[in-house]
């Protein structure tokens, strides 16, 4: 049964069908092979509905909507200008500012695609003008945007939390340390790159310009305060924090900044609705697929066949990293989380691994795979936005992928990088 389901998925993917079709088809085939007919079909429908029933999923369209509003408004530019005012003048400062701006906007929006658009669109031309190569600029924007997978809010963490039953609030807090560690790695590389290539520095901003930039960015900086402060302080659940972010974004862009008009609402709602529909369909069919393979005890059979259960906690973590990394090079990250998390669930439980640490590692691997050739989804986002050839986009990615893999190794060796803030906040 496993072979037929996997072959069906691969075959339909190669034929160019959207990911939801192979998942749904494989689920139906597996269901028929287990139950032998339509008699229990209502069970499959129930599993489809169960996938999108959790109230926590409401946070997904909320964060998507907030990100769309901010991308179309002034929040992103104000954050970029503030970062540039303080570190733009150092060696490699423009590149470091790009990485920091991606991280900061990721902490505001939770969306890698929104971050690529909001930060990459204004900063890539400035980087090219300053003397950075296009391949380096594109790779930096893509990989820095993927830090949004780790810095809360993170849609990937929400999906993992629902599938695994892990606290989304704990995942959000635990992602901060690894996200900042990766930002530091990228910043060091940017400085070294600028020194080696002889990239000139930007003019230094005066303290008056810095204070002005901070003043203008104070309102957008309220987003991470609402999310992290609200969850940490027990004021909001993650879902309530998402709703508060939407309200805050509407007030900022429509009332305070007046950067958007009533006529923009239709385009924003349409964009949010389309993205949300795709995510929810994937979650629904992914849940039915996960239920079928779990019911058939396929995960246990796979893990026993490859001997992962005897590998110990470190071996299980390495296997998880490799599986998620490779899968995300070819398949949408949400689908990978939905399909592979149940596969490794028995091994995670058997070895007593902290599900929060596992969630952070999975999220990191999703980030790496999404920016890795041949089919990482963020590569094609950059191709669509910047209108550059495929080879130009991927040429500068290897150093960043190496740093992300190094970050994963450090997390396995030193789990407190992720768990320290979690323990401080919740234990």
UniProtKB/Swiss-Prot annotation:
The keyword Membrane applies. It holds the Pfam family DctM. It is a multi-pass membrane protein. GO terms for cellular component: plasma membrane. Disruption phenotype: Deletion abolishes accumulation of ectoine from the medium. It is found in: Cell inner membrane. Its main location: membrane. The chain crosses the membrane at residues 13-35, 49-69, 79-99, 103-123, 147-167, 172-192, 216-236, 237-257, 273-293, 320-340, 356-376, 400-420. GO terms for molecular function: transmembrane transporter activity. InterPro entries: DctM (IPR010656), TRAP_DctM (IPR004681). Keywords: Cell inner membrane, Cell membrane, Membrane, Transmembrane, Transmembrane helix, Transport. Part of the tripartite ATP-independent periplasmic (TRAP) transport system TeaABC involved in the uptake of ectoine and hydroxyectoine in response to osmotic upshock. Probably functions as a recovery system for synthesized ectoine that leaks out of the cell. The complex comprises the extracytoplasmic solute receptor protein TeaA, and the two transmembrane proteins TeaB and TeaC. Belongs to the TRAP transporter large permease family. This is Ectoine TRAP transporter large permease protein TeaC. It comes from Halomonas elongata (strain ATCC 33173 / DSM 2581 / NBRC 15536 / NCIMB 2198 / 1H9). The lineage of its organism: Bacteria, Pseudomonadati, Pseudomonadota, Gammaproteobacteria, Oceanospirillales. The gene is teaC.
């Amino acid at each position: 049964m496993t072979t037929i389901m996997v072959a069906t998925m691969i075959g339909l993917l190669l034929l160019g069908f959207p990911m939801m079709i192979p998942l749904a088809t494989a689920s139906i085939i597996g269901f028929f092979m287990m139950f032998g007919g339509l008699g229990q079909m209502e069970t499959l429908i129930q599993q489809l509905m169960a996938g999108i029933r959790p109230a926590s999923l409401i946070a997904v369209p909320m964060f998507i909507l907030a990100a769309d509003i901010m991308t179309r408004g002034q929040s992103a530019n104000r954050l970029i200008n503030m970062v540039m005012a303080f570190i733009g003048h150092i060696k490699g400062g423009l590149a470091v500012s790009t990485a920091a701006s991606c991280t900061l906007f990721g902490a505001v929006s939770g969306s890698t695609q929104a971050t690529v658009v909001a930060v990459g669109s204004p900063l890539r031309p400035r980087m090219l003008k300053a003397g950075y190569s296009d391949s380096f600029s594109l790779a930096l924007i893509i990989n820095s945007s993927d830090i949004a997978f780790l810095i809360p809010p993170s849609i990937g963490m929400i999906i993992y939390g629902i599938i695994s039953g892990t606290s989304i609030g704990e995942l959000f807090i635990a992602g901060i340390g690894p996200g900042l560690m990766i930002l530091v790695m990228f910043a060091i590389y940017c400085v070294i790159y600028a020194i080696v290539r002889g990239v000139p520095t930007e003019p230094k901003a005066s303290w008056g310009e810095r204070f002005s930039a901070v003043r203008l960015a104070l309102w957008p900086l309220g987003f991470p305060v609402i999310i992290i402060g609200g969850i940490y302080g027990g004021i909001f659940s993650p879902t309530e924090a998402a709703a508060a972010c939407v309200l805050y974004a509407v007030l900022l862009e429509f009332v305070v900044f007046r950067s958007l008009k009533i006529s923009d609402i239709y385009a924003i709602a349409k964009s949010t609705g389309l993205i949300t529909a795709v995510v929810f369909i994937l979650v629904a069919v992914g849940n039915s697929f996960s239920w079928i393979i779990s019911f058939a005890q396929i995960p246990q059979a796979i893990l026993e066949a490859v001997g992962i259960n005897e590998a110990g906690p470190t071996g299980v973590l390495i296997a998880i990293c490799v599986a998620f990394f490779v899968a995300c090079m070819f398949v949408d990250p949400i689908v990978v989380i939905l399909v592979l998390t149940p596969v490794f669930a028995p091994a995670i439980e058997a070895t007593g691994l902290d599900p929060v640490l596992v969630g952070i590692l999975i999220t990191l691997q999703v980030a790496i795979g999404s920016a890795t050739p041949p089919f990482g989804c963020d590569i094609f986002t950059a191709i669509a936005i910047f209108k550059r050839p495929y080879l130009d986009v991927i040429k500068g990615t290897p150093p960043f992928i190496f740093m992300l893999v190094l970050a994963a190794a450090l997390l396995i060796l030193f789990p407190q990088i992720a768990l320290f803030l979690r323990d401080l906040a919740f234990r």
